[in-house]
Amino acid sequence: ILATGIFVLIQVAWLAYLLLYFYRDYAWISLLSTFIAIILVLKIYGTSTNSAMKMPWIIVILAFPILGILIYLLFGRSIVTRAVKKRFNSIEESYKKSLSQDENILKEVKDKDIYIYNQFHYLSNHEGYPVYKNTDIEFYSIGEEGLEAQLKELEKAEKFIFMEYHAIEEASSFDRIKDVLIRKAAAGVEVRLFYDDVGSIFFLNKDFIKEMRANGIDCRVFNPIKLAFNMFMNNRDHRKITVIDGKVGFTGGYNLADEYFNITHPYGEWKDTGLKLTGDAVRTLTMLFLSMWNSIKKTDEPQDD
């Protein structure tokens, strides 16, 4: 892991050195970089990305053309290969077809508040995510409350447990969850665990997947880091989802690492919120998990050996 990070930093530093060297000694490099910067700024401005995301890049590129262009090309673009994008979109669309909108629910909302109805109608018609009734929501103002509630519901699992997180840490908070997952897997419950490689890079050892699979837990990694730097490395999975039997779901801002539950304090007191959903709306959480899970092939993952 450390070697990978050092290798990437060396590549970035070397590219920056070369660009600055030519920029200083060759006037035409300055003119070319300015021209490219203008084209790039126009391209960024014309995208559908939120303005809050576009403006910082535009400012950096115009203020420091050479370095700005380099940094944007390395970290500013969300680059996904056509094959990966096609595979994910195909899987997501197939799952969305199973999520039908009850028009009576939209009518009820429209009769009560046209402003809220317009938002719900957009989500349902344009994004394919239905609006639900028959769902209880419990809000947790701190991650510690969410973790305790999550552990209680995991103990009740009878059919399946799906978990997808940006960061998982092998420490006391996740150890409690892992204990439940291992026991449930041994009892015949289907357990799937999915995490982002970069988010967990300093938290998990290289044998984590082996351990999970040895205990009957189907474990996958999103976009594992390769030694050679590539643009796709910047695409990360920041979801925090737990689904239990398709009836109960959890989401929120906390990952499964001790710092999120104030067991450790590397950045001071941490506050993140969480939600527990019980009822029909859990269907969408299930679809979101499965669409990402099934978009990752075995060939996309690091090998056990």
Regions flagged by a language model, labelled:
Residues I1-D305:
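N-terminal localization/anchoring segments of enzymes in phospholipid and broader phosphate metabolism
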